[in-house]
Swiss-Prot record:
Renumbered zinc finger spans (CCHC-type): 77-92, 166-181, 189-204
Gene name in the database record: vasa
Domain named Helicase C-terminal: residues: 506-651
Chain intervals for the UniProt region annotation (Disordered): 1-22, 35-73, 88-167, 676-703
Tissues where this protein is expressed: Expressed in ovaries and testis. Not expressed in somatic tissue of the ovaries including follicle cells, muscle and connective tissue.
Every Helicase ATP-binding domain range: 292-475
GO annotation, cellular component aspect: cytoplasm; nucleolus
Reaction(s) this enzyme catalyzes, per UniProt: ATP + H2O = ADP + phosphate + H(+)
Lineage of the organism: Eukaryota, Metazoa, Ecdysozoa, Arthropoda, Crustacea
Protein's name according to its UniProt entry: Probable ATP-dependent RNA helicase vasa-like
C-alpha cells in the first residue's frame, strides 16, 4: 500500500493539515477536542468526544471509524447486537427466514441510526460486513461497519441471520435436507419424483419434472392456395397402363359391387367429376375401381393396397359425394364442431397432404375440409374448424386434445377413415384410436361407414379391426413387398467417410443433365441430416433438410420449397417416406441404408410413381449394412435389376439370415376365409410390382 502513496500521504500524521480534509478541528466546545485517532479501527473513536488525536497510526486497533461506533473489540451477537453470546445461541426470537422479531435495537440498512442519539451524530453509513481488523481495515467480518456518523451509526447494514432451526420449516431438531415438511419439495429424484436414486441415475428420464426442450414458437400455417392444388399432383407416367394388370381380390358377404372401369360410371356428382378431370385423373386405379362403388353402397371396407396406388381418392371421393348429395350441414359457428367425415392418419405431413387432396376434389363446392395436427397453433385450427367443417383430417394426439376439451363431438359422424392403420399401430397410437372409437359421442358402428387403408393387414390388426367394422369387405389390390420395376436400382459400395464426396459427385452428375431434377436423400439420424444438408449448401447446391427436431414451420417450409423447386435436394430421415407424394422426384439416394428391407422398398417407392420412371442409388457400408446383403440381392433379383458381383459375394459370405422371402401373390389375406366365413369373388391377373410395404419404426414423434 505504501508504494502507491504520494509525498503528502507518506508524511507523519502530525504534519497533516486536518483542515485540508474539510473537517472541523473540534466539535461542541473547546473542551472537546477532535479525536484524530484511528480512522479505521475496531473500537470507540472517530470524531468522538474526549478522545485524543490518533491519526499517527490509522490502522491501529482501538477506535471507531470516522465518527462511527465501530463495535469492535468483543464480538457481539449478529442478531440482537448484545455481547456475551453468539448468533446461534441468541435468545431473541427469529422466524424461519432469519428475520428478527424481537430486536433490542432498530438499525437502518446503510443509515446507521444510533441507539443513543447525541449532538454530532447526523448520519451513518454502515454494512453488515464491517468489522475493522488489522488484516482488513475496511471491514471483512460480520461485526459492524465502516461509516460516517457517531454512536452506533456504523451499524447501518446489520444482517439478519436465522436461528438454529431448519431453514425450510423453522423448527429445531433437524436440518433442512431432512425436513419432514420439505417446503413442498420432493425428497426423491428431480426427474421422476421417486425415491431411491438420484436424477443422474433416473430409469424414467421422460417422466416428472425433467427439463424439457424449449417451447416451439407459435406457428400459424398459411392458407392453402387453391390454384396450386391442381398443379402439385403427380401426373400419370408412360407406364400407367400397367395398372390395368394389377391383381385384385375382394372378399366378404354379398352384395359386392363390381369394379367400375371409369369415374363416370361411379355416379359421382358432376362437380366432383369436373375436379377429377382438372386434377389429371384419366381412369381409376385398381383400388379405386373396387373400393369406391362399394363404399357408395354403404359397405365398410378394409383395403390393402401398395403405396402410390391412389388410396386417398378412394375414400375421399365417396365421402364428398355423400356430403354434397345430402346437403350435409357444416355446423358453422357452432361449438362443439360436428364433422360428417373424420380421417385419422399417423403423421402431420400426411394429414396436410390428405387435407389438400380433399380441398382439390371439393374445389368450388360448399364442402369444407379442415386439418388438426400438432406443432401448429391449436386455437387457429379450432377457429377454422368452428367456421364450418364437413371433413376433419387429424393426427391422433391433436384429435384427442380437442376431444377431451369438448371442442369436437362425433354425433353427426357418417364416415370414419383410418389411413395407414398398420403404421399408426406400430407408432403406438392403438390406445388413442380406441379412445376415439369408444368416445361417448361416437355414432354406433351400424350407423356409420368405417374404412381402413393400409399397405399390410396382419392377422392381429384384422382381429382388432373386426371390433369396430360392420360386415366389412376385405379388398386387397396389387403385390406388396416387391420393389417397383419402374425404379432403376443401383447399389454402390461406399465406406462411411467417403459418402460425402460420393454424394456430391452423384448430385453433380445428375443435375448437369437435368437441372430441375429433384433428389431425395435419406439418412438414418437427425443430426446427420443437418450435417449433410449443410455440407451440400457449402458446395453451392440448393439443399434443405427435414426431420423430427425441426419446428413444424421449418418442416412445412422445407417440404413446400422442395415441392416448388426452390430447393431441389431434400435431406430427410425416413419419416418422409410415410405416404407423401412429391411431384418430380427423379432420384432417391439412400445415404444410409435402413436396417429393414421393407423400409428400403418403401423409400425407393418415393420415385417411379403412377407409371413414371425413377432412379435409386444406395450407399452400402460393409461395417453397418452387412445384415441387408441377402435381402438386397433378393429384392434386386425380383425387380429384374443388375446385381453387382461384389454384393453377391458378400451375400454368400454373410452369416445373417434372410428376412425377405418375396412378395407372394397378395400382401394380406382375409382371416375370415380361413374360418370358413365370407363370400366373394376374386380377380387374378398378371402380377405387377408396384410400391412397397410400410417402413419400420423410427425414433421420431411426428404426431
Amino acid at each position: 500500500m505504501s508504494d502507491d502513496w504520494d509525498e503528502t500521504d507518506a508524511a507523519p500524521a502530525s504534519d497533516w493539515n486536518i483542515e485540508s480534509f474539510g473537517l472541523p478541528t473540534s466539535f461542541g466546545s473547546t473542551k472537546k477536542t477532535c479525536n484524530t485517532g484511528n480512522a479505521f479501527n475496531d473500537g470507540e473513536g472517530g470524531f468522538d468526544e474526549g478522545s485524543q488525536s490518533n491519526f499517527d497510526d490509522p490502522f491501529r486497533s482501538g477506535g471507531g471509524g470516522f465518527g462511527g461506533r465501530g463495535r469492535g473489540g468483543p464480538r457481539a451477537c449478529f442478531k440482537c447486537g448484545d455481547e456475551g453470546h453468539m448468533a446461534r445461541d441468541c435468545p431473541s426470537a427469529s422466524d424461519s427466514r432469519g428475520n428478527r422479531t424481537n430486536n433490542r435495537r432498530q438499525d437502518n440498512w446503510g443509515g446507521g441510526s444510533s441507539s443513543k442519539p447525541a449532538n454530532g451524530e447526523p448520519f451513518g453509513f454502515g454494512s453488515a460486513f464491517g468489522d475493522n481488523q488489522e488484516s482488513d481495515p475496511f471491514g471483512a467480518t460480520e461485526s459492524s461497519g465502516f461509516g460516517f456518523g457517531s454512536g452506533s451509526g456504523s451499524r447501518g447494514g446489520r444482517r439478519n441471520d436465522g436461528g438454529r432451526g431448519c431453514f425450510k420449516c423453522g423448527e429445531e431438531g433437524h436440518m433442512s435436507r431432512d425436513c419432514p415438511s420439505g417446503g413442498g419439495r420432493n425428497k426423491g429424484c428431480f426427474k421422476c419424483g421417486q425415491e431411491g436414486h438420484n436424477a443422474r441415475d433416473c430409469p424414467n428420464p421422460g417422466e416428472g419434472s425433467e427439463e424439457k426442450k424449449p417451447r416451439a414458437p407459435l406457428y400459424i400455417p398459411a392458407d392453402v392456395n387453391e390454384d396450386e392444388l391442381f398443379v402439385m399432383g403427380i401426373e400419370a407416367g408412360s407406364n400407367f397402363d400397367a395398372y390395368a394388370n394389377v391383381p385384385a381380390n375382394v372378399s366378404g358377404a354379398e352384395p359386392i359391387q363390381p369394379a367400375a372401369e371409369s369415374f363416370q360410371s361411379m355416379n359421382l356428382r358432376p362437380l366432383l367429376l369436373e375436379n377429377i378431370v382438372k386434377a389429371g385423373y384419366g381412369c381409376p386405379t385398381p383400388v379405386q375401381k373396387y373400393t369406391i362403388p362399394n363404399v357408395m353402397n354403404g359397405r365398410d371396407i378394409m383395403a390393402c393396397a401398395q403405396t402410390g396406388s391412389g388410396k386417398t381418392a378412394a375414400f375421399l371421393l365417396p365421402m364428398l359425394h355423400y356430403i354434397l348429395d345430402n346437403n350435409c350441414p357444416s355446423n358453422a359457428f357452432e361449438e362443439p364442431a360436428q364433422p360428417t367425415g373424420l380421417v385419422i392418419c399417423p403423421t402431420r405431413e400426411l394429414a396436410i397432404q390428405i387435407m389438400r387432396e380433399a380441398r382439390k376434389f371439393s374445389h368450388s363446392s360448399v364442402a369444407k375440409c379442415c386439418v388438426a395436427y400438432g406443432g401448429a397453433a391449436g386455437f387457429h385450427q379450432l377457429k377454422t374448424i368452428h367456421s364450418g367443417c364437413h371433413i376433419l383430417v387429424a393426427t391422433p394426439g391433436r384429435l384427442l386434445d380437442f376431444l377431451e376439451k369438448g371442442k369436437i363431438v362425433f354425433s353427426s359422424l357418417k364416415y370414419l377413415v383410418l389411413d395407414e392403420a398398420d403404421r399408426m399401430l406400430d407408432m403406438g397410437f392403438l390406445s388413442s384410436i380406441k379412445t376415439v372409437i369408444n368416445h361417448k359421442t361416437m355414432t354406433p358402428t351400424a350407423e356409420r361407414i368405417t374404412l381402413m387403408f393400409s399397405a399390410t393387414f396382419p392377422h392381429e390388426i384384422q382381429e382388432l379391426a373386426s371390433a369396430f367394422l360392420n360386415n366389412y369387405l376385405f379388398v386387397v389390390v396389387g403385390t406388396v413387398g416387391a420393389a417397383n420395376t419402374d425404379v432403376k436400382q443401383e447399389v454402390l459400395c461406399v465406406p462411411k467417410f467417403e459418402k460425402k464426396a460420393k454424394l456430391v459427385e452423384m448430385c453433380e452428375e445428375i443435375l448437369i443433365s437435368a437441372d430441375d431434377e429433384k433428389i431425395l436423400v435419406f439418412v438414418e439420424q437427425k443430426r446427420v441430416a443437418d450435417f449433410v444438408g449443410t455440407y451440400l449448401c457449402e458446395k453451392k447446391f440448393r439443399a434443405t433438410t427435414m426431420h423430427g427436431d425441426r419446428y413444424q414451420a421449418q418442416r412445412e417450409q422445407a417440404l413446400s420449397e422442395f415441392r416448388t423447386g426452390v430447393h431441389n435436394i431434400l435431406v430427410a430421415t425416413a419419416v418422409t417416406a410415410r405416404g407423401l407424394d412429391i411431384k418430380g422426384i427423379g432420384v432417391v439416394v439412400n445415404y444410409d441404408l435402413p436396417k429393414d428391407i421393407d423400409e428400403y422398398v418403401h423409400r425407393i417407392g418415393r420415385t417411379g410413381r403412377l407409371g413414371n420412371r425413377g432412379l435409386s442409388i444406395s450407399f452400402y457400408d460393409d461395417e453397418t449394412d452387412a445384415c441387408l446383403t441377402k435381402d438386397l440381392v433378393k429384392v434386386l433379383s425380383e425387380a429384374n435389376q443388375t446385381i453387382p458381383d461384389w454384393l453377391t459375394q458378400k451375400a454368400n459370405a454373410s452369416g445373417h439370415a434372410q428376412t425377405y422371402h418375396g412378395s407372394g401373390l397378395f400382401a394380406s389375406s382375409d382371416i375370415r376365409s380361413k374360418n370358413g366365413g365370407g363370400r366373394g369373388w376374386e380377380k387374378n391377373q398378371a402380377s405387377s410390382f408396384l410400391g412397397g410395404p410400410s417402413e419400420s419404426n423410427v425414433d421420431e414423434e411426428w404426431d
